[in-house]
């Protein structure tokens, strides 16, 4: 089994760019950024529970990474950079730390490296469980209205919140809930030590208004790019800034 994806060919021999979206996004999320890099092959993946992969069930990160590997093989992608946002960034970090073959470098935007104590995991498990129950039972417009009131999204304007709520409400609440629980921060290991031992380039992107993840970026051995005029979802709030950072990172 493989994940649904959209593939855009590039020049032969260059590493591919593999893009992983955030929770409730899909393969379209990164395209305004990725399509600025025509020289590279680009693969935009729908994670399980999302988009064209909505019907694919997973029990945890191991299943997600197994599906990611199978998808890369199916597209004959042998050398690649992983670029992931939020949930996609956590999947990318997990894959990198487990030694996914062919990985040339890692770019994470607003991805959490992991909780560091059991009490935090218990609290996160309860919180994600409450959200999952809401995704299963309530109209998605109501759930996402509240979702985007969370402190991490404080930099969004009312208009941006309204647009995101309308966009994300096109999802399937049941499959979102399942993926939220399967890949909760409560079940993700603390990756800091493994990330600090990576043998390939690791870059971290965060919006200048995203104080939480700017602080987390200092806890991993990554070169940090701060995206101006952006909060947690920097590639949506300032795509040109993220394109500039990726061009520097990839030397394109």
Swiss-Prot record:
Known pathway: Quinol/quinone metabolism; 1,4-dihydroxy-2-naphthoate biosynthesis; 1,4-dihydroxy-2-naphthoate from chorismate: step 3/7; Quinol/quinone metabolism; menaquinone biosynthesis
E.C. number(s) listed in UniProt: 4.2.99.20
Source taxon at top rank: Bacteria
Pfam family, one: Abhydrolase_6
Catalysed reactions, as listed in the record: 5-enolpyruvoyl-6-hydroxy-2-succinyl-cyclohex-3-ene-1-carboxylate = (1R,6R)-6-hydroxy-2-succinyl-cyclohexa-2,4-diene-1-carboxylate + pyruvate
Lyase among keywords: yes
UniProt-recorded Gene Ontology molecular function terms: 2-succinyl-6-hydroxy-2,4-cyclohexadiene-1-carboxylate synthase activity
Single GO biological process annotation from the record: menaquinone biosynthetic process
Family matches, as Gene3D superfamilies: alpha/beta hydrolase (3.40.50.1820)
UniProt cross-references to InterPro entries, sorted A to Z: AB_hydrolase_1, AB_hydrolase_fold, SHCHC_synthase_MenH
Record key words, sorted: Lyase, Menaquinone biosynthesis
UniProt xrefs under HAMAP family: MenH
NCBIfam families the UniProt entry points to: menH_SHCHC, PRK11126.1
Family: Belongs to the AB hydrolase superfamily. MenH family.
Subunit relationships: Monomer.
Biological role stated in the UniProt entry: Catalyzes a proton abstraction reaction that results in 2,5-elimination of pyruvate from 2-succinyl-5-enolpyruvyl-6-hydroxy-3-cyclohexene-1-carboxylate (SEPHCHC) and the formation of 2-succinyl-6-hydroxy-2,4-cyclohexadiene-1-carboxylate (SHCHC).
Protein's name in the database: 2-succinyl-6-hydroxy-2,4-cyclohexadiene-1-carboxylate synthase
Originating organism: Salmonella paratyphi B (strain ATCC BAA-1250 / SPB7)
